[in-house]
Amino acid sequence: MQNYDKKEVGSVPGAMPDFRGNDGSLVSVLKTLLFFTILMITLPIGLYFTSKSLLFEATLGYSSNDSYFYAAILAVLAVHVVLALFVYVAWNEGSRQWREGKQD
């Protein structure tokens, strides 16, 4: 009979680590992701239609074709701003969690 090393019952090489202690961190990450997902969908679309009808056509008096063009540019800029904000928040959240974990 072979003599095996005594190991923990659940320790399998290559098994997934136990993340049950990080539930608060996981919830925080999911809330951030959900917030920016909703913002990424609603802000550019809402900004496009609002700026087209209220800003460019009603206030500035642009034609319909011109207002389509400028409203699309504004919506694309909004997408880039939301993406930049997401990267900034995710970067800072990750470094904060890394610092807190390193101090343990």
From Swiss-Prot:
Keywords: Cytoplasmic vesicle, Endoplasmic reticulum, Membrane, Transmembrane, Transmembrane helix. Disulfide bonds: none annotated. The chain crosses the membrane at residues 29-49, 69-89. InterPro entries: Vma21. Residues 1-21 are annotated as: Disordered. GO terms for cellular component: endoplasmic reticulum membrane; endoplasmic reticulum-Golgi intermediate compartment membrane; ER to Golgi transport vesicle membrane. The keyword Endoplasmic reticulum applies. Its main location: endoplasmic reticulum. It comes from the Eukaryota. Residues 50-68 are lumenal. It is a multi-pass membrane protein. PANTHER family: VACUOLAR ATPASE ASSEMBLY INTEGRAL MEMBRANE PROTEIN VMA21 (PTHR31792:SF3). Required for the assembly of the V0 complex of the vacuolar ATPase (V-ATPase) in the endoplasmic reticulum. Belongs to the VMA21 family. This is Vacuolar ATPase assembly integral membrane protein vma21.
